[in-house]
Amino acid sequence: MKALIVLGLVLLSVTVQGKVFERCELARTLKRLGMDGYRGISLANWMCLAKWESGYNTRATNYNAGDRSTDYGIFQINSRYWCNDGKTPGAVNACHLSCSALLQDNIADAVACAKRVVRDPQGIRAWVAWRNRCQNRDVRQYVQGCGV
């Protein structure tokens, strides 16, 4: 009985924490979902962005007190413009989805929304972490050894 309780608590903690992808697992997943070369953006750049935005964590969130918005998920997609969290003033919801969809272990919705973000004129430059950590840098290390 104790073993079942411990197992239940372990499983509960896993579901609360969400999925933190291993580097190569995420690279393969993003490639399968059509991110490599999407709008001219290499898979290595997407991997660099995800590393510095969320640490590959699907449940990452970050509140922005200045505009009272929140960044959600593996790509840290913002509730001011891209998703609806029901609490961000003046939200646009350009991806037409709930922000909670960006926190799922299945990242298909997050990928679809990230593709929507880069179709705007700013492209991948919409992400501050990409500009600060990935732009004009050798990002091959993020996919090295992954066979992608």
UniProtKB/Swiss-Prot annotation:
Its EC number is 3.2.1.17. This is Lysozyme C. Residues 19-148 form the C-type lysozyme domain. GO terms for cellular component: azurophil granule lumen; extracellular exosome; extracellular region; extracellular space; specific granule lumen; tertiary granule lumen. Disulfide bonds join 24-146, 48-134, 83-99, 95-113. The gene is LYZ. The keyword Kinase does not apply. Belongs to the glycosyl hydrolase 22 family. It comes from Homo sapiens. It is found in: Secreted. PANTHER family: LYSOZYME C. It comes from the Eukaryota. The keyword Disulfide bond applies.
